[in-house]
Design a protein with these regions (language model features):
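Short alpha-helical segments that sit at the start of domains
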Residues: 1-23
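Short capping segments at the starts of secondary-structure elements
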Residues: 19, 30-34
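Pre-recognition alpha-helix immediately N-terminal to the DNA-recognition helix
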Residues: 22-26, 77
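A short acidic, leucine-rich amphipathic alpha-helix
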Residues: 36-41
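Short amphipathic alpha-helical interaction segments
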Residues: 42-58
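A short, conserved structural fragment
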Residues: 57-68
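Conserved segment of winged-helix/HTH DNA-binding domains
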Residues: 73-103
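Exposed, interaction-prone assembly regions rather than primary DNA-binding/catalytic cores
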Residues: 96-133
Length: 133
């Protein structure tokens, strides 16, 4: 059994749960980064840097080769899921408006879909909301 098989979604989410770990993870995702550049630009102590990268490596989100960090395939999936979450957060008030309209009136499925497509301007969020019900 590989070491990654023992990790749960909770382990993975915990490894990016604080803002500095998430920032480090996103920086690696945006371009394979050299260790020295990451250490200098993220404002982490040496211990903080190494404990966070060790956790990201341990959960299988990143890998290191020739002094550079890269996302693994699992890391790419987690990064894209995080982007969807961030899009949801950025559209919080639009989502609240949809919730409010849905709860204040009985609307049919067609009207609900039309409402979502009118208010939302992100196709990923639209497809998630249309599929929900």
């Amino acid at each position: 059994m590989s070491s990654i098989a023992a990790h749960s979604a909770g382990d993975i989410l915990r490894s990016i749960s604080d803002i500095k770990s998430l920032d480090l993870f996103c920086s690696i995702a945006k371009g394979n980064m050299e260790s020295e550049i990451l250490k200098e630009t993220k404002g982490l102590t040496r211990k903080q840097y190494y404990s966070r990268t060790r956790q990201l490596l341990k959960t299988g989100l990143i890998k290191r080769s020739k002094g550079r960090y890269y996302l693994t395939c699992l890391g790419a999936i987690v990064y894209h899921a995080q982007l969807v979450i961030q899009t949801g957060v950025n559209n919080y008030w639009k989502l609240k408006a949809i919730d409010s309209i849905q709860s204040s009136a009985e609307i049919g499925e067609h009207e609900r879909t039309k409402l979502i497509k009118t208010i939302m301007d992100d196709s990923r969020i639209e497809s998630i909301l249309v599929a929900q019900r």
